[in-house]
Amino acid sequence: QMNKVDAVIVLLPQEFRMDVLALAIENGVHFVETSYALPSYTDLGQLAEAKGISILPECGLDPGIDLVLAGQAIRELDEVHELHAYGTGVPEPAAADNPINYKVSWTFAGVLSAYQRPAKILKNGEVVNLSPSQMFSPENMHKVTLDTLGEMEAYYNGDAVKYLDILNIAETTRSTGRYSLRWPGHAAFWKKMVDLGFLKEEAIHVNGQEVS
């Protein structure tokens, strides 16, 4: 029935999106989704253009609304030297009643994938790459206090540098980062999990037995 609509909006887990995109291109239907763009979208974009349709990734909250707001702010400024973006989705304090002070509002696989994703930032004009373990280290985090929510911890979230060219501020920007906000204690738990290898899919050997 896809050929009977103008656009398909995908809110499915990431593993399904390429199949939906292939169907959208086949049927000549615009494709909108909330996840980060994939490198393969460059080639698929040519197929989409031939069909007269658009592929619009990163149209959610983060990424999405945050980038729209950043673009609007940038257009109102003469020059940008720093760009820092924060996004979050957390349970109310009374519901944060587990060791990670968090509850999944999207997919747990998506949460684990995000916590394995390295971060890329710009600091004093230098590109810095951070491993998943490094982004949860205290020296790479900071606290943010919000009037209605109180204190939260901020850790780096993915590649912030690529957006400088997209937003046309690469020449003037000296520092940039994208951050996720969580209740205090969240990052300390996940740093231990990352350091112990619990987020890796590769099997390890323990006393001669393969464990994954």
Locations of regions flagged by a protein language model:
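Short catalytic-loop micro-motif centered on adjacent basic/acidic residues
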Residues: 8-10, 31-34, 55-58, 84
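Rossmann-fold NAD(P)-binding glycine/threonine-rich loop
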Residues: 34-58
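ADP-ribose/adenylate-binding Rossmann-like module
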Residues: 13, 22-42
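Short glycine-rich, flexible loops that bind phosphorylated cofactors or substrates
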Residues: 16-17, 39, 92
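Adenosine-phosphate binding glycine-rich loop
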Residues: 51-95
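C-terminal catalytic/substrate-binding lobe primarily of soluble NAD(P)-dependent oxidoreductases
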Residues: 76-212
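Rossmann-like NAD(P)-binding element
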Residues: 1-17, 32
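Alpha-helical segments flanking ligand/cofactor-binding loops in enzyme cores
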Residues: 18-22, 46
